[in-house]
């Protein structure tokens, strides 16, 4: 099998949440536990840091990985979803897993996998953990896929757990209140393993304290610590300030655990995060005139901060190219759109996309003037054609809109 034949096989044979949604979601860990047994317990073969949260867990994971890389540690990084290439999910020192390793893993385990009814995410976790163990990483930063308690990554016993914040997202799976969602994400808190909470919230603080007490897990609230200033970083989204604070507090705690992380390593980790880890799609400027920015924010909380930052920018016209998936509360998101923005609606190229006719109806219900397009590239082209040098074009609403955009760049 070639690499592309391998991916075609996996996409066709294994249910993938990012593409099809609920049909691929499993509410238990048994398949992952069975997979780890088949692979001879790779999750026990490397040290790790486990990162959950509604927003910011991807950026935080990349920042922590970058700091460890600057300190000279061989650093694994597992994140999801990918934007362009599946291998973005699995990296060591910023380098994607080789294509032949992916193909080799699938070919050698294909028969066993077919009997286990694995999801795409379970399979990718198995590949990542097997790869990190075989390559003898010093540490792996592992981002939760969704939730925490029942996420496939939750077979780890890490050095440190991080929960960035709790908001309303994936409520059909994790619960319809912030408290219920916090309960799910708190499932990554392990016996005697310290946990850093990025944001203390009235509805969740008691839940985290109760569970950490039950687990004898030291708990640190990052926003109770106020750094004089943050290190320089190419990550310019206003929402990153909370992630910076969470990362700094986590790094300081890891230093106390004995990891050789100096202030210089931390500072350089922030400054070189994009270069070290190839993080993309976080308030990423793709063009200067007119300015084109993309961001993977995809829920009300994340897009509220994005819209505020766009509104504050000096500009002539604001052009918004937006598309969504079909399991988000899009009506609430559409209320955030500035009334003076020029709106281009589109449909990302995945089965889980919110169909353009439904999005057009929702926008009309909100009295939003708009034009609509069947794909992201056409919407972006229209925005570019209508713009002058002093305008700002923002592309987002979904990770998969950004993925479609970047795949053409």
Feature names for model-found ranges:
Residues 1-53, 60, 66, 70-71:
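Short functional linear segments
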Residues 45, 134, 139-144, 152-162, ...:
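Nucleotide phosphate-binding/pyrophosphate-handling subdomain across enzymes
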Residues 64-69, 132, 254, 363, ...:
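Hydrophobic alpha-helical packing residues
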Residues 148-150, 157-216:
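Conserved catalytic-core segment of NTP-binding enzymes
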Residues 198-220, 291-294, 334-392:
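C-terminal helical cap/extension that packs against the catalytic core
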Residues 398:
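Active-site-proximal loop/hinge segments that shape catalytic or ion-binding/gating pockets
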């Amino acid at each position: 099998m070639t690499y592309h034949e391998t991916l075609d096989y996996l996409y066709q044979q294994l249910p993938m949440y990012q593409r099809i949604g609920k049909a691929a979601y499993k509410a238990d860990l048994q398949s992952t536990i069975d997979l780890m047994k088949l692979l001879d317990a790779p999750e026990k073969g490397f040290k790790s840091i486990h990162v959950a949260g509604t927003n910011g867990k991807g950026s935080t994971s990349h920042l922590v990985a970058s700091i460890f890389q600057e300190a000279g540690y061989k650093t694994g990084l597992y994140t999801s979803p990918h934007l362009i290439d599946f291998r973005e999910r699995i990296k060591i020192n910023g380098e994607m897993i080789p294509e032949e390793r992916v193909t080799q893993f699938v070919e050698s385990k294909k028969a066993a996998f077919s009997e286990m009814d694995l999801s795409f995410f379970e399979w990718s976790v198995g590949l990542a953990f097997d790869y990190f163990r075989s390559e003898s990483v010093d540490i792996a930063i592992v981002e939760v896929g969704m939730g925490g308690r029942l996420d496939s990554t939750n077979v780890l016993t890490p050095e440190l757990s991080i929960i960035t914040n709790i908001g309303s997202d994936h409520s059909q799976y994790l619960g319809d209140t912030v408290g219920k969602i916090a309960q799910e994400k708190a499932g990554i808190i392990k016996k005697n393993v310290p946990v850093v909470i990025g944001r203390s919230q009235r509805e969740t603080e008691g839940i985290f304290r109760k569970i950490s007490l039950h687990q004898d897990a030291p708990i640190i609230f990052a926003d109770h610590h106020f750094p004089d200033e943050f290190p320089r970083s190419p990550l310019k989204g206003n929402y990153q300030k909370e992630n910076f604070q969470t990362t700094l507090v986590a790094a300081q705690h890891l230093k106390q655990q004995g990891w050789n992380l100096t202030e210089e390593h931390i500072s350089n980790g922030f400054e070189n995060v994009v270069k070290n880890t190839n993080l993309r799609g976080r308030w990423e400027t793709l063009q200067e005139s007119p300015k084109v920015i993309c961001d993977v924010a995809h829920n009300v909380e994340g897009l509220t901060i994005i819209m505020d930052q766009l509104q504050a920018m000096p500009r002539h016209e604001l052009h918004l190219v937006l598309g969504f998936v079909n399991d988000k509360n899009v009506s609430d998101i559409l209320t955030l759109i500035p009334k003076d923005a020029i709106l281009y609606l589109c449909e990302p190229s995945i089965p889980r996309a919110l169909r353009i006719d439904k999005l057009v109806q929702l926008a009309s219900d909100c009295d939003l003037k708009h034009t609509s397009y069947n794909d992201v590239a056409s919407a972006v082209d229209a925005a570019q054609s209508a713009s002058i040098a002093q305008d700002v074009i923002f592309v987002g609403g979904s990770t998969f809109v950004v993925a479609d955009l970047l795949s053409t760049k």
